[in-house]
């Protein structure tokens, strides 16, 4: 590097620091009201539906029908408090935490797959959780998701035209996604891996990666996915093979591997157009597995019917669209990418959960944001909404005239 190039790079870094300080010290406006209202609405509806869906299971497990609801409500309060606190903090501060988040995520992902680890929790033939069972537990993949979003947004926003190069625009991001994907597949956690890969890919695309590389990447991922499905169907890959077979026709083994999906379809169909009424689901009485977790949307369809389910999907759609509107109007590139990453992940997770319970894609462990039982997941979702609200507070005011 020549002296002139060094001086130019030094001057550019100084300008970036000045810009960041300016944004940090800038007077903040109010939070985006439509986004805030939609977030609160989904949180409240989610708690109501969780109370209804979880009552029989909670009574069967603990003797207290409100057990799961009370725990979720407590985490909702904590999460909402966190959302408002994060919404008040300037989102630029997350830049400094991006590398620390990646390091923490990798450490936790390695920790969860260590054999005979007393802190690792196994359920449904997958070891995805850390903590003390029945007291406190969380999925390291949730931390990994946030780490990828913040790190990608931070580094991509600084590179700009360098995103067109292999060395700086492709290799470091693909390498990180590859490491995280391998660690998550060892749990195994296929759905979480797909979500993180897709979110990372979208951020790279928005960040300026070349179109032909995107097409090649999508083609490669599609080929690998198709190969996995074919190998699972043939029985070569044991993990997921039964799920894929039952996805084609759950009635082939109704009392075995096809039971969960078959019950989900029965639950959805039982609701009809208007539903059986809030709290009146019959399938939640231990017929439908995971009725308060991954398959809670089936209970929503049964109790509220097609119309109620469509209203909830509309609220999700409005929240996601409003989030992307905030991204389009963000003050800077980092804020825009941060919101795009958060909303992309939310959109994909919501779509995949509904697709799973409806039988459009093979059954896999993926929760419905704001609805499924899981305190730490809900807290992190609300904190992410707080990050979006923080970006919305610094949207430049429209010029008069």
Feature-to-residue mapping (PLM):
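Alpha-helical transmembrane segments of multi-pass membrane proteins, especially transporters
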Residues: 168-173, 196, 217, 247, ...
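Hydrophobic, glycine- and aromatic-enriched re-entrant/interface helices and adjoining loop segments
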Residues: 120-137, 216-311, 331-335
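Loop-to-helix entry and N-terminal half of a specific, functionally important transmembrane alpha helix
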Residues: 327-365, 371
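Membrane-helix boundary/helix-loop-helix interface segments in multi-pass membrane proteins
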Residues: 2-37, 41-42, 48-187, 354-369, ...
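Alpha-helical transmembrane segments of polytopic integral membrane proteins
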Residues: 47, 83, 149, 153, ...
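Interfacial segments of multi-pass membrane proteins
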Residues: 156, 194-213, 282-308, 367-381
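Hydrophobic alpha-helical segments of polytopic membrane proteins
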Residues: 77-79, 99-106, 167-185, 190-232
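Hydrophobic alpha-helical transmembrane segments
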Residues: 74-79, 303-323
């Amino acid at each position: 590097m020549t002296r002139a190039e060094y001086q130019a790079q030094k001057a550019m870094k100084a300008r970036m620091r000045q810009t960041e300080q300016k944004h940090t010290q800038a007077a903040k406006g109010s939070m985006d009201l439509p986004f805030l209202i939609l977030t609160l609405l989904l949180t409240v509806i989610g708690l109501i539906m969780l109370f209804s869906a979880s009552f029989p299971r909670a009574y069967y497990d603990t003797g207290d029908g409100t057990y799961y609801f009370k725990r979720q409500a407590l985490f909702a309060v904590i999460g909402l408090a966190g959302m408002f606190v994060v919404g008040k903090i300037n989102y630029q501060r997350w830049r400094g935490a991006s590398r620390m988040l990646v390091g923490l995520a990798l450490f936790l992902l390695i920790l969860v797959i260590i054999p005979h680890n007393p802190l690792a929790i196994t359920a449904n033939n997958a070891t995805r959780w850390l903590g003390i069972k029945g007291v406190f537990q969380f999925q390291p993949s949730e931390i990994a998701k946030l780490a990828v979003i913040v790190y990608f947004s931070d580094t991509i926003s600084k590179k700009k035209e360098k995103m067109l190069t292999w060395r700086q625009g492709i290799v470091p991001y693909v390498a990180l996604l590859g490491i995280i994907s391998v660690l998550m597949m060892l749990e195994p956690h296929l759905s979480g891996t797909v979500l993180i890969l897709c979110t990372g890919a979208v951020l790279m695309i928005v960040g300026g990666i070349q179109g032909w590389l995107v097409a090649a990447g999508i083609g490669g991922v599609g080929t690998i996915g198709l190969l996995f499905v074919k190998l699972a169907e043939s029985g070569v890959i044991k993990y997921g093979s039964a799920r894929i077979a039952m996805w084609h026709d759950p009635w082939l083994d109704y009392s075995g591997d096809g039971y969960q999906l078959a019950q989900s379809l029965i639950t959805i169909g039982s609701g009809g157009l208007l539903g059986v009424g809030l709290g009146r689901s019959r399938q939640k009485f231990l017929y439908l597995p995971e009725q308060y977790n991954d398959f809670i949307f089936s209970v929503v369809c049964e109790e509220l019917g097609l119309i109620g389910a469509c209203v909830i999907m509309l609220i999700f759609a409005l929240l996601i669209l409003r989030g992307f509107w905030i991204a389009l109007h963000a003050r800077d590139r980092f804020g825009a990418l941060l919101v795009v990453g958060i909303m992309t992940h939310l959109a994909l997770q919501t779509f995949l959960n509904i697709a799973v319970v409806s039988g459009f894609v093979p059954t896999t462990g993926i929760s419905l944001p704001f609805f499924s039982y899981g305190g730490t997941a809900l807290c992190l979702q609300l904190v992410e909404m707080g990050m979006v609200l923080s970006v919305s507070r610094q949207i430049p005011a429209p010029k008069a005239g």
